[in-house]
Amino acid sequence: MIIVLSPAKSLDYDTPPRIKTHTLPDFIERSAVLIETLRKLSPAQIGTLMHISDPLAVLNANRYADWSTEFTADNSKQAVLAFDGDVYGGLDANTLSADDLQFAQQHLRILSGLYGVLRPLDRMQPYRLEMGTRLANPGGKDLYAFWGDDVTLALNALLQADDDPVLVNLASEEYFKVVRPKVLKARIVTPVFEDWKGGRYKIISFYAKRARGLMARYAIEHRIADPRKLKHFDAEGYAFAAEASDDERWVFRRKAA
């Protein structure tokens, strides 16, 4: 069983990493191709492309300029410790044990516009490049064209040791589109998190994002390799709703946040 998460736009490179253990991304040379494409853009062009403010555009232009194929303790940080935001607030990787992180290293992957797919302990230099960005590149009109089957094949290589391979999709729709179901040699299960509001259950973005991180943490702490055990997930009041679920879409609900 492999869990996939989306990355986060918010990054934390101020807090020193609490462990030194690290790996390197699998697709550094591919990332370098995208960086070269991004370096050709002015801050104004970056701002227009990514729909971000002028200060953010300048910040990211500088990040692209500084990016290197050499990943060091000074210019990078383990991905799961560098990403911030709602999902990663739920995951709270800074409070996971070293053994927890090693389990995550085997069972968790983070999809990325720049890096393709990351292990939790892969060193990562700061960047902003959302998967849905329409960045024309040597591979085509956007990042889905650029990554092609690469991400899916990397996941297949990881899943091939499982007797009944299952990919648990805790990523957003934008990011999961980089995974090609027809190429993937695994069953896909997508947990959905709903909260009670206005007299009915609905997906509330902030809560749903946090719940994805909470479920990833639950799987790590309980060493879950059989996805069926995820149905026991009960963090922060969620419970599996069998009546609203099917084989591919598992719904978890709670009455009060």
Curated annotation (Swiss-Prot):
It holds the Pfam family H2O2_YaaD. One of its GO terms (biological process) is response to hydroperoxide. Disulfide bonds: none annotated. GO terms for cellular component: cytosol. Belongs to the UPF0246 family. This is UPF0246 protein RSc2009. It comes from Ralstonia nicotianae (strain ATCC BAA-1114 / GMI1000).
